[in-house]
């Protein structure tokens, strides 16, 4: 049902975010939720005064609803489910037979990078615990590759591992021994380990600079092709910063060419990837139908239509099959965020944006009467979806999450309004002033708060109380990486169309620096924020393990989406290839 028909609050089906009338009256829940509101018809005939509006001339979507509805792989059938179970038994046997800690660590690393580590969580944790307990007795035998892999895999799993384990590879002056640079595999492993650095760990800072220098040397030498590919891949972006699902697709192809490939593990990785992709396609078809029927794309033609790209962000944040509802919510949220962001950045007048922000903050239907028609549609879109999600959540879990979701929306809109005010007054903030607002305007907190509620945290009352008090820092850190990676690739185009100065321009203005120096400063800032976020790898927050993973993955997804340019605003190029490999094309099985 399109948005120009009657809407009731809340709509009843979370799975579709449709505009249907709920079966039960909900006036006892939120008074405004049960009112019947007629959405205005947007048309070329309008009584509103004509305003000179900017246009970003966004490219239309390259992913039509008809195309998305055609995505339907056959990897969900019982024959594949049965084959997966047989392959899992074989891989479990390989885990049991892995001879010695190095072989065990290498197999665990393969499992995780191939994307099937989640199928063997118990076995992996037991094996890592055993290796950790035996560390003191065996560490004298370890080479650089083994030591680095031990550090990376265990720290990533929350074990308390000190970088002091690398001290025996350093000379009496405190520098890394030059002799270890002759080992490209060891260099690669140490390089990857260094990116799990926390603030103050200077040994790992030095390791990163040392290995980067020598890996660039090895990249040009005659080494085994798979090692050369891994070096090139790592220098582009380390494992710890990569979007896991996308990296798994890359690593499956590499693993096929590596020496010592386990054929049954390779088959498991390919089949599991295709089966999960099939589940993703089912969700994507559902979300695309919702967006097509919702009608907002036609009415808000000033905004980016990026449903497929939004679903990429959802996969990047939580890809596991059991989080399908969360991905649907996040994909819909991402598309609504795109509309609201473009309304503030491009289309809305200063006075209109003040009224809209006030309406979202009040969360009251009566406040929309003074809004122009297009803004009424935008307000009702976020109001409808939020109240609907809250209704379903209350029904399923007995907890009212609407106050948290509406506050997240209000905070987001207030941050966008602040930027609009800066543009209108031609004000350039300091970098700190910009970042204090921009981590919210990037939408990271809004996305992560939805991810928390819809990724299955329980018991809810205790989880919410703990979440509100203990997760503000990791949300801010993840959202800051999101903001800064975006700025590095989109700032020039956005400023050209009249957007607020971004982090690069703020630092240029504040420090009197060149653009090249400012870009280097922002890259350094990103590394600094990653170090701070890495503290959460070992933080005692096991009850929020899923949420912490989502926070890390949001930062990783932004890093990958903006690695080759504006992978969200410009719907082609390298990111089109990434989306195709994630959601369109299955891996060929031999």
From Swiss-Prot:
Record's keyword annotation contains Chloroplast: yes
Pathway annotation: Secondary metabolite biosynthesis; terpenoid biosynthesis
Molecular function per GO: magnesium ion binding; terpene synthase activity
Record gene name: TPS1
Chain residues that bind (2E)-geranyl diphosphate: 304, 341, 345, 483, 486
Gene Ontology terms: cellular component: chloroplast
Subunit relationships: Monomer.
Designated name of the protein: Monoterepene synthase TPS1, chloropastic
Subcellular location(s) of the protein: Plastid, Chloroplast
Protein's organism: Cananga odorata
Transit peptide in keyword set: yes
Residues reported to bind Mg(2+) 3: 486, 490, 494
Record's comment describing the protein's domains: The Asp-Asp-Xaa-Xaa-Asp/Glu (DDXXD/E) motif is important for the catalytic activity, presumably through binding to Mg(2+).
Superkingdom of this protein's organism: Eukaryota
Comment on bound cofactor: Binds 3 Mg(2+) ions per subunit.
Alphabetized UniProt keyword annotations: Chloroplast, Lyase, Magnesium, Metal-binding, Plastid, Transit peptide
Taxonomic placement: Eukaryota, Viridiplantae, Streptophyta, Embryophyta, Tracheophyta
Required cofactor names: Mg(2+)
Family statement drawn from the similarity comment of this UniProt entry: Belongs to the terpene synthase family. Tpsb subfamily.
Binding positions (Mg(2+) 2): 341, 345
InterPro entries: Isoprenoid_synthase_dom_sf (IPR008949), Terpene_cyclase-like_1_C (IPR034741), Terpene_cyclase_plant_C1 (IPR044814), Terpene_synth_N (IPR001906), Terpene_synth_N_sf (IPR036965), Terpene_synthase-like (IPR050148), Terpene_synthase_metal-bd (IPR005630), Terpenoid_cyclase/PrenylTrfase (IPR008930)
UniProt-annotated binding residues for Mg(2+) 1: 341, 345
Motif (DDXXD motif): 341-345
Broad class of the protein's primary localization: plastid
């Amino acid at each position: 049902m399109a948005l120009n028909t009657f809407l009731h609050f809340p709509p009843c089906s979370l799975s579709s975010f449709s505009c249907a009338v709920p079966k039960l009256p909900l006036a006892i829940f939120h008074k405004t939720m049960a009112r019947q509101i007629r959405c205005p018809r947007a048309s070329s005939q309008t009584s509103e005064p004509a305003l000179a509006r900017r246009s970003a001339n966004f490219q239309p979507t390259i992913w039509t609803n008809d195309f998305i509805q055609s995505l339907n792989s056959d990897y969900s059938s019982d024959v594949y489910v049965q084959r997966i179970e047989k392959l899992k038994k074989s891989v479990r046997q390989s885990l049991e037979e892995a001879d010695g800690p190095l072989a065990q660590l290498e197999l665990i690393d393969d499992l995780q990078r191939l994307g099937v580590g989640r199928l063997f969580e118990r076995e992996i944790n037991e094996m890592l615990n055993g290796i950790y307990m035996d560390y003191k007795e065996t560490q004298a035998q370890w080479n650089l590759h083994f030591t680095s892999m031990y550090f990376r895999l265990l720290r990533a799993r929350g074990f308390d591992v000190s970088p002091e384990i690398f001290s025996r590879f350093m000379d009496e002056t405190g520098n890394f021994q030059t002799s270890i640079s002759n080992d490209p595999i060891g260099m690669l492993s140490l390089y990857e380990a260094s990116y799990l650095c926390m603030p103050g760990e200077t040994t790992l800072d030095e390791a990163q600079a040392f290995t980067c220098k020598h890996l660039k040397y090895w990249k040009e030498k005659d080494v085994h092709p798979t090692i050369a590919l891994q070096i090139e891949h790592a220098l582009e972006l380390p494992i710890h910063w990569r979007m896991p699902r996308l990296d798994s697709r890359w690593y499956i192809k590499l693993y096929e060419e590596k020496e010592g490939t386990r054929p049954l593990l390779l088959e498991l990785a390919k089949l599991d990837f295709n089966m999960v992709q099939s589940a993703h396609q089912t969700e994507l078809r559902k979300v695309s139908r919702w967006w097509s029927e919702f009608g907002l794309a036609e009415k808000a033609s000033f905004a980016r239509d990026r449903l497929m790209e939004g679903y990429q962000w959802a996969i990047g944040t939580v890809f596991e099959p059991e989080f399908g509802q969360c991905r649907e919510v996040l994909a819909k949220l991402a598309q609504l965020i795109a509309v609201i962001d473009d309304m503030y950045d491009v289309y809305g007048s200063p006075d209109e944006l003040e009224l809209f922000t006030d309406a979202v903050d009040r969360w009251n239907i009566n406040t929309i009467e003074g809004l122009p028609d297009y803004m009424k549609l935008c307000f009702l879109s976020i109001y409808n979806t939020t109240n609907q999600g809250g209704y379903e959540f209350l029904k399923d879990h007995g907890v009212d999450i609407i106050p948290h979701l509406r506050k997240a929306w209000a905070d987001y809109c207030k941050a966008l309004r602040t930027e609009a005010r800066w543009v209108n007054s031609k004000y350039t903030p300091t970098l700190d002033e910009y970042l204090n607002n921009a981590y919210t305007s990037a939408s990271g907190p809004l996305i992560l708060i939805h991810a928390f509620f819809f990724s299955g945290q329980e018991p809810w009352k205790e989880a919410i109380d703990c979440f509100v008090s203990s997760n503000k820092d990791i949300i801010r850190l993840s959202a800051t990486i999101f903001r800064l990676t975006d700025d590095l690739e989109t700032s020039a185009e956005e400023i050209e169309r009249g957007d607020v100065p971004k982090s690069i321009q703020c630092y240029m203005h504040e420090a009197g620096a060149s653009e090249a120096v400012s870009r280097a400063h922002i890259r350094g800032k990103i590394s600094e924020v990653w170090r701070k976020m890495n503290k959460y790898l070992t933080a005692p927050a096991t009850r929020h393990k899923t949420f912490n993973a989502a926070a890390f993955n949001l930062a990783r997804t932004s890093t990958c989406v903006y690695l080759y340019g504006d992978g969200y605003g410009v719907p082609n190029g390298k990111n089109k290839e990434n989306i195709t490999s994630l959601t369109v094309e299955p891996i060929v099985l031999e």
